[in-house]
């Protein structure tokens, strides 16, 4: 069975891991980094992902960042003269991760476990699964990020019973999950969160502050300048990271814009105290989900044994202090906040493939599910924090006499009125026999699978007619769209592979030309003109092919040159070996001739 890789598809950074034996291992990207920026850029028809894309974000307007924040929406991004869905951009990141995982493993990868924030709704989960499919991956399981982190933390502690609180503050989302660990069972008791809170918001506070200060000083609003704004974003992210280790950092952006008198520069000092002041409201927002999760789990702070920090934003000192103050505990530092989620996903891949034994993962649905009933009321069928997979049915009836059809409006959320919750989808059950209101029996059944993806069935118990839908939100892609995007992704992968092969061939040609010219020069006047002339002729042919740019011709001429150059090199080595042998023979003969020169006669007297 092929390996199932674990992928943490993050807002700011992503990571991929694989199980080696029973240990999860993070796979480094081609640049040697263990996490990859979730950035995609387009240049001259080429798709660039990761570190290289992030480096050119300032100068390349066709760069897409933080696409995860748009997952599950119908919003598209414009780049490269086209419009892309969030699923397509995410698929490009997944394809890149998949590609370097395949290089590391030396085999094709077709299956993955992908993580999502615990508080992702159905549309966002479905979009993630679609992105995987477009990237050529069979998504074996969608796992909540805090749950994956708990798996990685607790894999070697399966004999120990404890309750842990996972505090996961990433680039764009925030989750808190409470789990009970014991006997290899990872049981999620409750989860809470905020899908609109993360490191990007902390960056934005610094950006707003820089824009405001610069405007006060120079009267120019940098927020209207796209390139300046990207430079501000880079500087804000760097300053935020610096302030995790030092109490003050210098922000220096020369030539940020131009005024009437000429170029203007942005120079300022940002202290940790000022940063804490700017982001106080964001840190405050992390407290409510912690309290909510504890309340839903029916636990008090004293019941929690360990607090695990996940996500790069948990390195912010004010966040760490807030966690300490809120939980009364020193956070556990045994896991790497940037890598632990991907490692947990790889472990779940091992559970699915059977490589990891005696581990059971019981996750929950983060939000309540139900339908709209008379008066616009939201009637819940499945309460939040219900263990999944699960199924729940309830019987409803018609609201009017002789009603021929019922509209089923499926919702997700916690508010009492339907209008205040998230619509997952609508469908209709038709051909209900004429009857007074309240007589027909319509059974509505909700199913949530292990990935947290919802399907709903409505059945007329009188006629046994039923209608089933797997929820397709307004951002959902049809099978045809996914198929088309998969083909596009495959074509891009082929084009990338072709481009890579072309670069490698050109490099080989350059190297061969250089090496052969050197050998021809070194063999001048050494007596094997036939081989030198043949190599020179093949070299001239390759140079012509190089100028023409015909790859097939270059390949053929390169092979011919290698053959002739090899023959020349053999002659050179044969000559060198013969000379060496002759020298060794001469030295041996000289030693023999001189062997009697230093002989002294001695006298021997017998006593």
Curated annotation (Swiss-Prot):
GO MF terms, alphabetically ordered: ATP binding; ATP-dependent protein folding chaperone; unfolded protein binding
Acidic residues composition-biased segments: 595-607
Modified residues (Phosphothreonine): 173
Segments for region (Disordered): 579-607
InterPro entries referenced in this protein's UniProt entry, alphabetically: ATPase_NBD, Chaperone_DnaK, Heat_shock_70_CS, HSP70_C_sf, HSP70_peptide-bd_sf, Hsp_70_fam
UniProt biased composition (Low complexity): 579-591
CDD domains xref list: ASKHA_NBD_HSP70_DnaK-like (cd10234)
Lineage top rank: taxon: Bacteria
SUPFAM superfamilies the record matches: Actin-like ATPase domain, Heat shock protein 70kD (HSP70), C-terminal subdomain, Heat shock protein 70kD (HSP70), peptide-binding domain
Induction: By stress conditions e.g. heat shock.
Positions of transmembrane segments: none
Keywords: ATP-binding, Chaperone, Nucleotide-binding, Phosphoprotein, Stress response
PANTHER family, sorted: HEAT SHOCK PROTEIN 70KDA (PTHR19375)
The family this protein is said to belong to: Belongs to the heat shock protein 70 family.
Task performed by this protein: Acts as a chaperone.
Name of protein: Chaperone protein DnaK
Taxonomic lineage from the root: Bacteria, Bacillati, Bacillota, Bacilli, Lactobacillales
Gene assigned in the entry: dnaK
